[in-house]
Amino acid sequence: MSIRLIAVLSAASIAVTSATPVADSSCTISSFDQVASVLAECTDIVVSNLEVPAGETLNLETKKKGVTITFEGKTTFAYKEWTGPLLRVKGKAITVVGAKGSVLDGQGQLYWDGKGGNGGIKKPKFFKIKATEGSHFKNINLLNCPVQVHSIDHSGPLTLSGWNIDVSQGDKDALGHNTDGFDINTTDQLTIEDTVVKNQDDCIAVNQGTNFLFNNLDCSGGHGLSLSVGTSHEIIKNTVRNVTFSNSVVRKSRNGIHIKTTYQFRGRYPWRMLTYSNIAMEGIWKYAVNVEQDYKKGKPTGIPVGNIPIKGLHLEKVTGTLTGEESTPVYIICADGACSNFNWSGVSFEGASHASNCSYVPTGYSC
């Protein structure tokens, strides 16, 4: 072989080597000081057995489109009294995956004092997502979240599937509080499916948005499947439309279904196209279905106000059992003319201590 040919081949080899993608090991985050460089260089990222320092946010915000992030092993967030969030993920068309056996541990047991976000120890919120363009988060396991677990904001289209949120240790001595599973704002086209939530507050809390599907959820210990609107001074943020809960179970919870409007501010549009289909309940101790237009500053007043009308609440095959001295199957308190087009079928409950109480009676149900 001529010296010239050897030189050509060597140059080609160097060119191929320089074009080779960054090695997998260089795209693994196992130390907090690697986060920024890995996000800047990689599109297939692994977070492996990471310990996040106290008072720091694991900020996985990427400007690249189509990035994949995989959590392996145990990601632990060190204790500090602060507001958080512990974890932030933002991106377009991103995929976030929990590998088999992985867990994100918020160490909530170090914070819980029975007061949640209402006082006592300052507690960090856990997980904040802003994801668009068909992003998918799947098989994520969250353990012992200090306070509100998960916030979805300015997102969609977005799918979350196969999640497991376990804050059940907070049940002991009623120390866990305000541990909402998913709080959702300013989002369009969201699906959450095949997910388990064990907590002490709302399993799902929809505050604003359109075109939501929640399917095959298993919720226990909290406040049920909730819609809560009216707390923002921005009218558009008090809008909810086209929301479906289906094929889900609510166990050992304060409420099964909770729909409430707050009358500090007005909504632009009435709530429409709200559907609960094939919902089973077990051990509900307050209300199986609770619709209230009387909330102010986080509490019911007994005086309903029609600032945000509810026009269209469809319940189909919603059944279950209640328990305890406070239990009531259905409680509806609506302002005059502010509730309409409630069409229910196959709605029945057993074991309640009190009869249903409705200021507006749905078609297909007897209060």
Swiss-Prot record:
PbH1 repeats lie at residues 187-208, 240-261. Glycans are attached at residues 185, 242, 343, 357. GO terms for molecular function: polygalacturonase activity. Disulfide bonds join 27-42, 203-219, 334-339, 358-367. The keyword Hydrolase applies. GO terms for cellular component: extracellular region. Its EC number is 3.2.1.15. InterPro entries: Glyco_hydro_28 (IPR000743), Glycosyl_hydrlase_28 (IPR050434), PbH1 (IPR006626), Pectin_lyas_fold (IPR012334), Pectin_lyase_fold/virulence (IPR011050). The active site is at 201 (proton donor), 223. The keyword Lipoprotein does not apply. It is found in: Secreted; Secreted, Cell wall. Keywords: Cell wall, Cell wall biogenesis/degradation, Cleavage on pair of basic residues, Digestion, Disulfide bond, Glycoprotein, Glycosidase, Hydrolase, Repeat, Secreted, Signal, Zymogen. SMART domains: PbH1. Expressed in larval carcasses and gut, and adult gut. Residues 1-19 form the signal peptide. Belongs to the glycosyl hydrolase 28 family. This is Polygalacturonase. It comes from Phaedon cochleariae.
